Design a protein with these regions (language model features):
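Divalent cation-coordinating acidic motifs and surrounding scaffolds
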Residues: 2-8, 14-248, 258-260, 264, ...
């Protein structure tokens, strides 16, 4: 009798399930239910350079997140879409820089607020930390077994001697190759959005490597629309002679209101709308090409 009591009071050496374990188990159950109901899975990860020059694209990602989700959900009800974000900077060269991750989720209503907290800032030299970005995509994102895609937006290339013309960190090349190979093994299709020429060489090299690893990689031209210049053919006031104007033909002028009249106050808003629309349409086209 005494031995039975000892057994009852003996400590349980099995570790209590952690919150992460419970969440993983629940995810497996939910995925099993979806499979039995014929629901297909599509995981879409945005990999976005979040250094100082990329504010317009972060804003577009925030403002179009729900529009993209609504369109895909209504057009393809047989799919369960999840969306995630990796916002990367350049801690390799600027030690105060950090990367920020929003894991895959189908709770799209929460995305605008989360993305709205991301600030375009940082960046040291011209190349950025593509290695860190893809490492997070491989290690910090909860990919499912369905269709997987990365949409990578950048206006600057990667560190590493094979990816940029001049760099202080040539050893990054081997690291980036390793991360790309891991993505290819996961069967992730990558779309590379070239925003500026500075990034072209890196995107081209990544595409070449990724295809050699058996992966699918498509390059998309996605330049930022240039702002209108205050040339006299557009804004010149009729009462001012060419000789008296303070600006040359194709020169921006701090005194343009005196020379050319005021800028259309709706112009900035129109440019934002144009970028949002192009971003939304390009993402939808890329996703639909995989369905």
């Amino acid at each position: 009798m005494e031995s039975e009591k000892k057994e009852e009071n003996a400590p349980n050496n099995e570790a209590a399930p952690t919150l992460k374990t419970k969440e993983d188990n629940m995810a497996k159950i939910n995925n099993s239910i979806k499979e039995n109901n014929g629901i297909k899975e599509f995981d879409l990860l945005f990999l976005i350079d979040a250094t100082g020059s990329m504010g317009d694209y972060i804003r577009a990602a925030k403002e179009e997140s729900e529009n993209i989700s609504t369109k895909l959900r209504t057009s393809y009800p047989e799919y369960n879409f999840q969306y995630g974000y990796v916002f990367y900077r350049d801690p390799i060269d600027s030690k105060s820089d950090i990367h920020e991750v929003i894991n895959l989720t189908d709770n799209v209503n929460s995305l605008p607020e989360k993305i709205g907290k991301i600030k375009a800032q940082g960046g040291g030299d011209l190349p950025e930390d593509w290695v860190g970005a893809f490492k997070l995509a491989n290690e910090s994102i909860s990919w499912r077994n369905g269709i997987k895609s990365i949409m990578h937006l950048a206006d600057a290339g990667a560190h590493g001697k094979e990816f940029t013309l001049s760099d202080k960190y040539p050893e990054e090349s081997a690291k980036l190759k390793d991360e790309l190979m891991k993505c290819a093994k996961k069967n992730i299709k990558i779309f590379g959005y070239i925003i500026a020429e500075d990034a072209r060489n890196s995107f081209n090299k990544c595409q070449e490597l990724y295809k050699s690893y058996g992966g699918s990689y498509e390059i998309c031209e996605f330049p930022k629309k240039e702002k209108k210049r205050y040339a006299r053919r557009e804004y010149k006031a009729e009462s001012i002679d060419d000789e008296e104007c303070c600006c040359d033909e194709d020169m921006d002028c701090n005194e343009r209101e005196e020379c050319y009249g005021d800028k259309d106050e709706d112009e900035d808003e129109d440019e934002e709308d144009d970028l949002n629309e192009r971003f939304r349409d390009r993402v939808l086209d890329n996703v639909e090409s995989m369905l």
